[in-house]
Amino acid sequence: MKKRALISVFNKDGVLDFAEFLVSKDIEIVSTGGTYKYLKENGIDVIEINEVTNFPEMLDGRVKTLHPLVHAGILAIRDNKEHMKVLEEREIHTIDYVVVNLYPFFEKVKEDLTFEEKVEFIDIGGPTMLRAAAKNFQDVTVISNINDYEVVKNEIENAGQVSLKTKKKLAGKVFNLMSAYDGAIANFMLADEEEYPEYLSVSYKKMQNLRYGENSHQSAAVYSSTMVDGAMNTFETLNGKELSYNNFKDVDIAWKCANEFDEPACCALKHNTPCGVATGENSYEAYMKAYEVDPTSIFGGIIGFNRKVDKKTAQEMVKIFLEVIAAPDYDEDALEVLKTKKNLRVLKFHNTPKAEKCMVTVDGAILVQDEDNKLIDEIKVVTEKKPSDEEMEDLLFGMKVVKYVKSNAIVVAHNGIALGIGGGQVNRIWPTEDALRRGKGATILASDAFFPFRDVVDKAAEGGIKAIIQPGGSMRDQESIDACNEHGIAMVFTGFRHFKH
C-alpha cells in the first residue's frame, strides 16, 4: 500500500515545493478545498477528500475532513492487528503524513471584525486532524508549521523516513500550538463574561531566544501575545543589537512612563527605576531637563520619549553612553546621528501602552491583576491652604512619575521636572530623605501610598515643599493634615494608591 499524505493548509507558503517532493517519493496526496485546487492548478497529482470519504463538503466548508474514513486512517496503530484488520475490512487507507496549518484566528481576533466574523476563523477540522496525528506520532508524521517542511524533507531524503525522535518533537509542537490556539479562543469567548475564568489560558508565541536572563547564568526568551498588538511586541529596531532581557523590562517602563503625559515628555531609566523624568515644549527640552537632574545615573540608561526625536536631541544623546532609545518616530537626520553609535539600540514604537492585565509568577502559582492604569479617583483638598494652579500641575506630574518607582516611593518636583526620586525602601521616611536630598528647589512632593505618621510632612517642610499629593486612607490622616496646616503646606488626597513591588 502506498504511503499517503493529507494536506490542508491556509498558509500555502512552501507547500507546493513540499508536495512535489512527496510525489517524487511516491507518496500519494489527499487534499481539501482551496488547497486541493491550488495543488491541482500547479500540476500536482492530488486526490480530493470527497473521493476518500464518498461524502461532499457541506455547511459552507465547515465539514470536510470530520469523517471516520479520514480519522481511522490517521489513528490506526500499525502494529495493532485488530486496528489493521478493521481498516482492511472497511477499505480504509492509512494516512502517514498530516500537513495542516490553521485558520488565522490569532491574526483575525486582533482585527476590527464583528464577533460573528471572528468566530468563522475558529478552525475545527484542522485541529482535529492535527491532534489525531500527534497522538499517533509513532506511525504518523504531523507538520503544523511551514518551517518544518525542510526538516521532514531532509530526513526522508537522507534516511528514507522520518525518525521517531523527530515525529515526537513534531507532535509536541502540535499540542503546544493547540494549547495556545485554544487558549486564545477561550480568552476571546470569555472576554465579556468572566474577568478571571476558572482556568487561565495564556496564548503567547516566541519572538526570540535571548542571550541570557536577568543574569548571565539564567536562560531566557521573550514571547509575544497572540491576542493584543501592544507596545512591546510591535516595535521596530532601527539600529543596534537585539534587546536583552533587562532591556525589555526597562524599555517597557520607560515607554509607559513617558506616555503618561499629554505634553512632550522624557523618561530616563536605570534598573527599572526612573532616574530622570521631565516634560517640555518638545523632546529636546524634556530630555535636557531629565538629563540635567541626574547626569550620573543616566549613563548606560534607557530613554523613553512620547514625541518624535529630532537631530538636536539626538546630538545630545550620543554624547553619553546609552543602552536604548524608545520613541514613536525619528527625523531622518536624527536617525543618521544615532546610527553613528552602532551598539545603541534605537526603537520605533507603533503602539501606546494598552495592557489591561498584568501577571507575576510565584512558586507554583501565577498572580493576575488589573494593570495600574488609573491615576486618581478624585482630587480632594484636605488642608486649609489650597494648591495653586501651577502647584496642582506639578502634583499631578509627580503622581504620574511615582507610579513607576518601587515602593515605598517619593518624588519631589517643580515645573514639570522630577528633581528627586526616592524608592525601594522599607519605610516612607528614607525615600523622602533621599528625594529631598537630591531634589533641591522642589516645591511639591508625591507619595505612592498614604502617610502612617506625620514625619514625612515634617521632613517635607524642612525641604521647602509647598504642596503634597498622596492617596490618603491612613488611620492617622488627621495628624498629617494638622502637620501641613502647621507648616502652611497644601495637601490633596487622590483615593488611589500606587504600590509597585
UniProtKB/Swiss-Prot annotation:
<dbReference type="InterPro" id="IPR002695">
    <property type="entry name" value="PurH-like"/>
</dbReference>
<keyword id="KW-0378">Hydrolase</keyword>
<dbReference type="GO" id="GO:0005829">
    <property type="term" value="C:cytosol"/>
</dbReference>
<dbReference type="Pfam" id="PF02142">
    <property type="entry name" value="MGS"/>
</dbReference>
<dbReference type="InterPro" id="IPR024051">
    <property type="entry name" value="AICAR_Tfase_dup_dom_sf"/>
</dbReference>
<dbReference type="InterPro" id="IPR036914">
    <property type="entry name" value="MGS-like_dom_sf"/>
</dbReference>
<dbReference type="InterPro" id="IPR011607">
    <property type="entry name" value="MGS-like_dom"/>
</dbReference>
<comment type="similarity">
    <text>Belongs to the PurH family.</text>
</comment>
<dbReference type="GO" id="GO:0004643">
    <property type="term" value="F:phosphoribosylaminoimidazolecarboxamide formyltransferase activity"/>
</dbReference>
<dbReference type="GO" id="GO:0003937">
    <property type="term" value="F:IMP cyclohydrolase activity"/>
</dbReference>
<keyword id="KW-0808">Transferase</keyword>
<keyword id="KW-0658">Purine biosynthesis</keyword>
<dbReference type="GO" id="GO:0006189">
    <property type="term" value="P:'de novo' IMP biosynthetic process"/>
</dbReference>
<dbReference type="Pfam" id="PF01808">
    <property type="entry name" value="AICARFT_IMPCHas"/>
</dbReference>
<feature type="domain" description="MGS-like">
    <location>
        <begin position="1"/>
        <end position="144"/>
    </location>
</feature>
<keyword id="KW-0511">Multifunctional enzyme</keyword>
<dbReference type="InterPro" id="IPR016193">
    <property type="entry name" value="Cytidine_deaminase-like"/>
</dbReference>
<protein>
    <recommendedName>
        <fullName>Bifunctional purine biosynthesis protein PurH</fullName>
        <ecNumber>2.1.2.3</ecNumber>
        <ecNumber>3.5.4.10</ecNumber>
    </recommendedName>
</protein>
<comment type="pathway">
    <text>Purine metabolism; IMP biosynthesis via de novo pathway; 5-formamido-1-(5-phospho-D-ribosyl)imidazole-4-carboxamide from 5-amino-1-(5-phospho-D-ribosyl)imidazole-4-carboxamide (10-formyl THF route): step 1/1.</text>
</comment>
<comment type="pathway">
    <text>Purine metabolism; IMP biosynthesis via de novo pathway; IMP from 5-formamido-1-(5-phospho-D-ribosyl)imidazole-4-carboxamide: step 1/1.</text>
</comment>
